[in-house]
């Protein structure tokens, strides 16, 4: 137990040696410390606010001028957009009159439907249904 006490004492001595030594002037200056008085600072801030309020009134008139300029610019931009629109008449040769668009091919939809029905009847059973069932049977 005496050894533990000796180790603790050595540790304390080492810790204090690592600390910065306290100078006499820092320890006790002989004066009482007081909190800083911010009243003077508050008065200066109040004066600055009053001056900025006066300058702000002048800045507001500048802001009104810039708003008017922005509105004029928007009107001009709208006029330019209207001028850019090409409102030419639609050429009648570009209108497709006969049903669906087929890229120049003429397709008989009734005949195509009949051919698809014939192919479906010839195949008999739907192959997709069998493939879907095979996936769940544990194959694959």
Curated annotation (Swiss-Prot):
Chain intervals with Basic and acidic residues compositional bias = 1-28, 37-51
Q: Which SMART domains match?
A: CHZ
Q: Which UniProt keywords apply?
A: Chaperone, Nucleus
Answer whether the UniProt record assigns the keyword Chaperone to this protein.
Answer: yes
Main location (coarse class): nucleus
The record's family statement is: Belongs to the CHZ1 family.
Entry function: Forms a chaperone-bound H2A.Z-H2B complex that acts as a source for SWR1 complex-dependent H2A to H2A.Z histone replacement in chromatin.
Assembly notes:
Forms a heterotrimer with H2A.Z-H2B, stabilizing the association of the histone dimer. Also, with a lower affinity, forms a heterotrimer with H2A-H2B.
What is the protein's name according to its record? Histone H2A.Z-specific chaperone CHZ1
